[in-house]
């Protein structure tokens, strides 16, 4: 939704986890006024600044039920809702819908909403129509915006021709509260029983890297004709210790997973993805968050980021996308619709188009 604000951008935030707390601290630095914070259960009624480890800001954490959301939106009239909670669209919709219906643009950290048309074809169309009907934009950003899509598309611009693109990403999951769903520390037998009792939900059934690569294919104007997915559960080859979680993991137990995807295009370019999500093994010198992009073509290119600083770059990517979301036309947008992300050094309101 195009904007011509006279004052600062006003935003509400959903989620007080790692990303949410970082945004509470960072939004004021970019001239964004925080007018509301929502959480499912934790910290309700507390000062959100204190929850984030900052000075008190006077913005209390509210419950995220529909009535509470609409009440805060009606009272504070924000320009943007930043949602840093879950990934899957069915769980996100109860948060997105009241925002959209109240005329509030939405920026989400969801890896599935980043390019949802292959996973939620009907839900994506419905969300697009709802956003257009209310004149607002819905968009998802985060680490994938830069490292999984934009860097790849930029590298292709330095080539005469391309045969394939191989993207390998290692993400350590220690600092994120969802790590237990991976079955960390379980034996193979225990993990198989765990899966029977806890079927993989939609939020963890799809590789974020594969979804982002589909977005890259679209951004490059290519046509995907086939996709092949694989999953390997990773087990420790020796006793290991994770310092951040103070967690001992015995040899032969689950430490993470490796999701692989191959996407073939009608234009003859093949995309290969390997997304490794695991607990860091510090004794092996593994800090995690490695990102590598290999382009086979003319010329061959190999770009390695040894540590992409996942927590920080997720938040920074979202902050820098705020003006892009507010400047975009109504509807559900993906990275294929917007310009490349870049650092916004001035107050974010200065980047809004009239």
Residue ranges and their predicted role:
Residues 111-136:
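Rossmann-fold NAD(P)-binding glycine/threonine-rich loop
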Residues 40-42, 86, 104, 110-114, ...:
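Short, ordered loop/turn segments at secondary-structure junctions
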Residues 69-80, 89-111:
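Rossmann-fold NAD(P) dinucleotide-binding segment
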Residues 2-33:
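NAD(P)+-binding Rossmann beta1-loop-alpha1 motif at the extreme N-terminus of oxidoreductases
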Residues 30-54:
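NAD(P)-binding Rossmann-fold cofactor-contacting core
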Residues 58-68:
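Short acidic-hydrophobic, aromatic-tinged amphipathic segments that line or gate anion-handling sites
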Residues 10, 14, 18, 22, ...:
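Active-site-lining helix/loop region of Rossmann-like oxidoreductase modules
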Residues 280-354:
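C-terminal helical cap and adjacent loop that interface with cofactors, partners, or active-site loops
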């Amino acid at each position: 939704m195009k904007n011509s604000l006279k004052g600062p951008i006003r935003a509400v935030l959903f989620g007080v986890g790692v990303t949410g707390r970082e945004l509470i601290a960072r939004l004021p630095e970019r001239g964004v006024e925080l007018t509301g914070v929502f959480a499912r259960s934790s910290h309700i009624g507390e000062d959100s600044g204190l929850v984030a480890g900052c000075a008190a800001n006077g913005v209390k954490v509210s419950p995220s039920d529909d009535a509470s959301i609409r009440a805060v939106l009606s009272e504070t009239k924000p320009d943007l809702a930043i949602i840093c909670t879950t990934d899957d669209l069915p769980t996100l919709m109860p948060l997105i819908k009241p925002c959209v219906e109240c005329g509030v643009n939405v920026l989400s950290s969801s890896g599935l909403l980043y390019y949802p048309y292959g996973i939620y074809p009907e839900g994506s169309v419905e969300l697009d129509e709802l956003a257009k009907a209310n004149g607002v934009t819905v968009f998802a950003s985060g680490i994938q915006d830069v490292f999984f899509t934009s860097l790849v598309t930029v590298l292709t611009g330095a080539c005469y021709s391309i045969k394939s693109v191989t993207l390998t990403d290692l993400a350590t999951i220690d600092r994120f509260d969802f790590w237990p769903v991976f079955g960390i520390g379980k034996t193979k037998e225990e993990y198989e029983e765990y899966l029977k009792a806890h079927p993989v939900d939609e939020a963890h059934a799809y590789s974020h890297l594969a979804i982002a690569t589909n977005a890259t294919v679209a951004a490059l104007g290519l046509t995907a004709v086939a996709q092949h997915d694989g999953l390997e559960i990773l087990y420790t080859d020796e006793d290991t210790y994770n310092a951040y979680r103070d967690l001992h993991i015995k040899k032969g137990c689950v430490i993470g997973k490796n999701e692989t995807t191959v996407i073939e295009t009608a234009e003859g370019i093949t995309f290969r993805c390997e997304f490794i999500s695991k607990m860091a093994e510090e004794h092996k010198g593994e800090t995690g968050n490695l990102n590598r992009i290999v382009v086979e073509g003319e010329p061959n290119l190999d770009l390695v980021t040894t540590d992409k600083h996942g927590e920080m770059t997720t938040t920074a990517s979202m902050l820098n996308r705020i003006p892009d979301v507010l400047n975009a036309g109504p509807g559900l947008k993906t990275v294929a619709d917007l310009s490349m992300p870049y650092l916004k050094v001035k107050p974010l309101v200065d980047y809004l188009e009239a």
